[in-house]
Amino acid sequence: MKKQRNLRSMAAQAVEQVVEQGQSLSNILPPLQQKVSDKDKALLQELCFGVLRTLSQLDWLINKLMARPMTGKQRTVHYLIMVGLYQLLYTRIPPHAALAETVEGAIAIKRPQLKGLINGVLRQFQRRQEELLAEFNTRDARYLHPSWLLKRLQKAYPEQWQSIAEANNQRPPMWLRINRTHHSRDSWLALLDEAGMKGFPHADYPDAVRLETPAPVHALPGFEDGWVTVQDASAQGCMTWLAPQNGEHILDLCAAPGGKTTHILEVAPEAQVVAVDIDEQRLSRVYDNLKRLGMKATVKQGDGRYPSQWCGEQQFDRILLDAPCSATGVIRRHPDIKWLRRDRDIPELAQLQSEILDAIWPHLKSGGTLVYATCSVLPEENSLQIKAFLQRTADAELCETGTPEQPGKQNQPGAEEGDGFFYAKLIKK
């Protein structure tokens, strides 16, 4: 039996680590969830994700409710109050329970002397809620994005930026990829129906299914046997453009955690696939995914800027470059991205992408296909990146995705319920 812990204080400390220390919630949350009971795991996740999704609103409210910000060793209390406000605003937790548990969180973070302060701030919000929210809804903070990102979205998409920001603030659906080597999509949907769940096929991507209601993976028919993988529909779109064939030598560059590596092998089981990533730790997930699906690929640790170090002079029939990027297209899945990224990161990422493209291009065979993909919505990483590459690379030709003036295909967050994603298909003359 797991020791009863105060979830509100755990959520506050997790959010503090993201915002103040720049840590990823994906790294922080799983170990915390191991410390709580199964029934509390979902609530802990909801509190962490929810506070990060609405952080700018909660911050604005605290500044209105408190004369002075909490600093130094008391900073965790600031985030604990955020957790309390989030519950009052966005959850069905009865207000008295939300207040009581949040106030008790002060003991867990060793600040019992501040219980009265926390209680007072939250009760003041309850009294002034209508007035405060009316004022908040006139401010830029209502878009729940940092100002630098809003400015970039406004510049790139003068007509769409508000809908993009709104889509980023929604909860994402759960998309699955059916392993066509085991089941047709229709036959797996029948199994899902027998298990008491409902799914909907994607109109364009032949392996994609959206669950009506997200479910734990162990409840999915055949998950442990490799019949199905969790992967957003937009990420599955990479295979439409890559179109891998049996017998080909295919490189999946920046491959971790391996979702696209295994998709290549589902589409072309007899392809010779090399999966490369710079992060040795994340490569363990590539091995895990290959093992669960019963597949084989050559997995290597390597830097995409220096391919000769890990593949010599080898050339490939097809290359999938899922480039390192700002991840501004998947904010709805990872709301911490809004607070981890900085404006200065964008030119640095664009430079890295450019270096990888230039370095890997000589390793594509003549007549071969390279698909450049990101989960970003920013032109500097996408259309402008490919436009510049085409201008400096005489033997590169854009194929099927956009025009030389506006290269690539940009999926916006929420379009057909998928993530924000960019694809450009290039052919080597």
Curated annotation (Swiss-Prot):
Entry EC no(s): 2.1.1.176
Recorded family membership: Belongs to the class I-like SAM-binding methyltransferase superfamily. RsmB/NOP family.
GO terms of molecular function: RNA binding; rRNA (cytosine-C5-)-methyltransferase activity
Predominant location: cytoplasm
Source organism (scientific name): Shigella flexneri serotype 5b (strain 8401)
GO cellular component, one term: cytosol
Pfam families recorded: Methyltr_RsmB-F, NusB, RsmF-B_ferredox
InterPro entries assigned: MeTrfase_RsmB-F_NOP2_cat, MeTrfase_RsmB-F_NOP2_dom, NusB-like_sf, NusB_RsmB_TIM44, RCMT, rRNA_ssu_MeTfrase_B, rRNA_ssu_MeTfrase_B_ent, RsmB-like_ferredoxin
Keywords assigned by UniProt, alphabetized: Cytoplasm, Methyltransferase, RNA-binding, rRNA processing, S-adenosyl-L-methionine, Transferase
Family matches, as Gene3D superfamilies: Helix hairpin bin, NusB-like, Sun protein, domain 3, Vaccinia Virus protein VP39
Source species, domain of life: Bacteria
GO biological process per UniProt: regulation of DNA-templated transcription; rRNA base methylation
Residues where S-adenosyl-L-methionine binds: 254-260, 277, 303, 322
Record's subcellular location: Cytoplasm
Role according to the record: Specifically methylates the cytosine at position 967 (m5C967) of 16S rRNA.
Range of residues in the leader sequence: none
Stated name of the protein: Ribosomal RNA small subunit methyltransferase B
Active-site residues, record numbering mapped to chain: 375 (nucleophile)
Catalysed reaction, written as an equation: cytidine(967) in 16S rRNA + S-adenosyl-L-methionine = 5-methylcytidine(967) in 16S rRNA + S-adenosyl-L-homocysteine + H(+)
